[in-house]
């Protein structure tokens, strides 16, 4: 099946969104570590960055090759957001991940409208992964909402990493 231009466009938009967010999240990881002295929060955000720049990018790139659609890299990064504390940073990331969910929903909608069920099936992976990523970020956000201080939050994040490592799982 030949892909419609709309499907090609949303696929490229998603590819570029992942490149952009991966780069932005890498910067946020540095902020979490350098400005807020929260290395486990930084690791969490860096893992989110690596997920976007690694797994997501690779899946889209491989799928584009498989179905022979062109990918066009068109993104620029200007990290103008300057959080005053880690709670504000995580809230911003949560809001960003909510926008990603809407973007993926639109991608799925376009695929269905265009009758491209193969690409829709591919997009379902991003729906599932987006649910997991959003829930992980929301968990960290909730730690800040319910914790008394950043040290408690940092400890809770560390405990999540330790528990997941014991089970051989990754957070992101």
Swiss-Prot record:
The keyword Iron applies. Keywords: Iron. Transmembrane segments: none annotated. One of its GO terms (molecular function) is ferric iron binding. It comes from the Bacteria. Residues 1-148 form the Ferritin-like diiron domain. This is Uncharacterized protein UU427 homolog.
